[in-house]
Amino acid sequence: MQDLFGSVRRSLVFRSTTDDENQENHPPPFPSLLADKITSCIRKSMVFAKSQSPPNNSTVQIKPPIRWRKGQLIGRGAFGTVYMGMNLDSGELLAVKQVLITSNCASKEKTQAHIQELEEEVKLLKNLSHPNIVRYLGTVREDETLNILLEFVPGGSISSLLEKFGAFPESVVRTYTNQLLLGLEYLHNHAIMHRDIKGANILVDNQGCIKLADFGASKQVAELATISGAKSMKGTPYWMAPEVILQTGHSFSADIWSVGCTVIEMVTGKAPWSQQYKEIAAIFHIGTTKSHPPIPDNISSDANDFLLKCLQQEPNLRPTASELLKHPFVTGKQKESASKDLTSFMDNSCSPLPSELTNITSYQTSTSDDVGDICNLGSLTCTLAFPEKSIQNNSLCLKSNNGYDDDDDNDMCLIDDENFLTYNGETGPSLDNNTDAKKSCDTMSEISDILKCKFDENSGNGETETKVSMEVDHPSYSEDENELTESKIKAFLDDKAAELKKLQTPLYEEFYNGMITCSPICMESNINNNKREEAPRGFLKLPPKSRSPSQGHIGRSPSRATDAACCSKSPESGNSSGAPKNSNASAGAEQESNSQSVALSEIERKWKEELDQELERKRREITRQAGMGSSPRDRSLSRHREKSRFASPGK
């Protein structure tokens, strides 16, 4: 045994080249052959193979499939149904899209091929991560369905929000479009084309963040569902580009066309082309004419330019998603530039501005319900009444012939381009008068949402000069003008309040019309009295509409009472007409107020009598229908209760 190990040691360490040459000419002895075999075995063993890298078991190991449980139905599409699911391992909520797998033997091979392609593509999509795209979590294959596990977005799609809330304002459209382009830019940078951008495939979470869904693998899903006998993509032709319909080959520019159609959908609340053509007619029209959908008229110039660039007929002329992210409609830079221009104009004016008001965004808006906050621009006086606007919307928007027109905000100062004012020898746009702004206000709600602009010129030495100053925390430039403006506004509000009060009940309207037709003096005294007593007592308390009698019964008593009031007042007014004004003014006012109070008390008494008669008539009808009578005692008690109930009609 020792000789054996000794020979092995000598063969490993002490062998020389001469021994090898001798072995070539002479056959080796038996111990030497055994030593060579042992040496080769040792060299092939793991002791001498440490330098070789072991196989990576982590890449070879396949993760177990996600265990999930199906929940309620979320939606149903052309290529399958979407359910809510739960990951049984982590508890995460999922959106599971189920695609049917055909059992036909003829198309089984094609089905398996598409399933493998879809699974491979989902594996690639799992590596994508962006806040504006839906994450792919994996696939689970079952006997008759293929389940695609997606990120669950709780808010719903844009199309569902349009059905609930109607068309979006332009500010919301701008926010959603910006996020849509960010997600689309990420997909295009990873060489992924969406192919089916529309409101139904754009999801919104609770924070207003949108996420693109059904991208990348949509082509494989469509082919797989077509083999299974699913219907065509319903509604999608409205968003298709002409090159997609003609099947002449399309690229990322087809997604840009769909972005423009989606913006039209958000602005109008309806799918593009849906008002003019049905689906088949829309396909024929788009494919033959290559025209873009009609652009709405109620959008700004920036939004119009954005849509025209997205809906170019030639695909090569359409901008990319990265270029559209720099458009003024998405960034809103034109609005900021208009604010900077206004700030520079105020800095160069003759009246110095406070240091804290050099930035246009620092203008203060009123958070109270009154209309008392007035900021004076010298002779340009703007009354701000924004009780419901947040601080984020405190920038002043000016509308000119080339300015930014923001349709979603009503708090803007309208500028008339046709009229001009002179400023240091130069001409510029002038502002509308306050009376014109008042004419556009028809309701009380519009008073708190519009910016009233008052313009007057201060003439001196034969030259017209416009002084601009901003004094928010200081007294106004002219207290008399402020008082006059406030009095006009209060008078306007009083008139509107009186008109609204008239519409509350037909009784007051008929009484008011009778007073007007009978005597103008009564009408004037009534209006003056109402204005004097409006704060402590308000308007006349009238019975509710539901308990008021018919118009035929009420129409007689006010007219008779009015005639009586006018007849009783006419001698007194005739006697006082010939007297001097300085001695009989107070007596005439007292007589008018007394006659009016008598007329009102007479009308109230007539109303109460007619109400009692009407209630008694209804009570008899109810008793007759029930077939049972009531005793005189019960009738008197009930009548007493009804009288006490209607003693105060306003309660």
UniProtKB/Swiss-Prot annotation:
UniProt KW keywords: ATP-binding, Coiled coil, Cytoplasm, Cytoskeleton, Isopeptide bond, Kinase, Microtubule, Nucleotide-binding, Serine/threonine-protein kinase, Transferase, Ubl conjugation
BP GO annotations: cortical microtubule organization
Residue numbers binding ATP: I74, G75, R76, G77, A78, F79, G80, T81, V82, K97
Localization terms from the record: Cytoplasm, Cytoskeleton
The keyword Cytoplasm is annotated on this UniProt entry: yes
GO terms for MF: ATP binding; MAP kinase kinase kinase activity; protein serine kinase activity
Active site: D196 (proton acceptor)
Domain Protein kinase residue range list: 68-330
UniProt feature coiled coil, ranges: 105-130, 605-628
Record location of the Glycyl lysine isopeptide (Lys-Gly) (interchain with G-Cter in ubiquitin) cross-link: K108, K110
GO cellular component term of the entry, any: microtubule
Amino acid composition bias (Basic and acidic residues), ranges on this chain: 464-477
Alphabetized SUPFAM superfamilies for the sequence: Protein kinase-like (PK-like)
Principal cellular location given in the protein's record: cytoplasm
This enzyme's EC code(s): 2.7.11.25
Disordered, as annotated region: 460-483, 537-601, 618-651
Polar residues bias: start-end ranges: 570-599
Family statement: Belongs to the protein kinase superfamily. STE Ser/Thr protein kinase family. MAP kinase kinase kinase subfamily.
Task performed by this protein: Involved in cortical microtubules organization and stabilization by regulating the phosphorylation state of microtubule-associated proteins such as MAP65-1.
Protein name per Swiss-Prot or TrEMBL: Mitogen-activated protein kinase kinase kinase 2
Annotated source species: Arabidopsis thaliana (Mouse-ear cress)
Lineage: Eukaryota, Viridiplantae, Streptophyta, Embryophyta, Tracheophyta
Gene responsible for this protein: ANP2
